[in-house]
Amino acid sequence: MAHPPLEPIEALASATAQSLGFLMESVVLHSHRAPQALIVAVRKGDGSDVNLDDCASFSQAFGEALETGELLTGAYVLEITSPGLGDVLQQDRDFRSFRGFPVCVRQRDAKGGEIQREGTLLGRDADAVELNLRGRIQRIPRSDVLEVRLTSPSA
């Protein structure tokens, strides 16, 4: 099955989320599955936690909008989630929202390999991701950062 363009689906998800007081975080379409799976992550605009009822209300409104817009052909599964533990931070707002949270940064080392560092996220700017690593501040150049993922606090 051909992968439909994501831009119109993302635009519809964003508009639907905004109309309900949510922010659309991400849209992922797994068109290789049978049935295909559309996974949309939302968060509340006021920063409070998303609950099951929130996911259900967004699912109903977005599902109806998808059907009306005929953006997906064939059968599909619609899954609504919220960002949380284990999620990859990508957008600037993610780095602002999760400042002070424990993260794992996967980065390139000087020899071209990969290393992981776990610490507390202090922020991200145009040049670097800044972490507190056991009391020491470290700036990791963004060009070396492969992934920043939320983790659970170390014991």
From Swiss-Prot:
Entry superkingdom: Bacteria
GO biological process: ribosomal small subunit assembly; translation
Keyword RNA-binding: no
HAMAP family on file: RimP
The gene coding this protein: rimP
Location(s), subcellular: Cytoplasm
Gene3D superfamilies the record matches: RimP-like superfamily, N-terminal (3.30.300.70)
UniProt-recorded name of the protein: Ribosome maturation factor RimP
Family: Belongs to the RimP family.
GO cellular component, one term: cytosol
Species this chain originates from: Synechococcus sp. (strain RCC307)
Keywords: Cytoplasm, Ribosome biogenesis
Main location: cytoplasm
One Pfam family from the record: RimP_N
Keyword Cytoplasm: yes
Function (record text): Required for maturation of 30S ribosomal subunits.
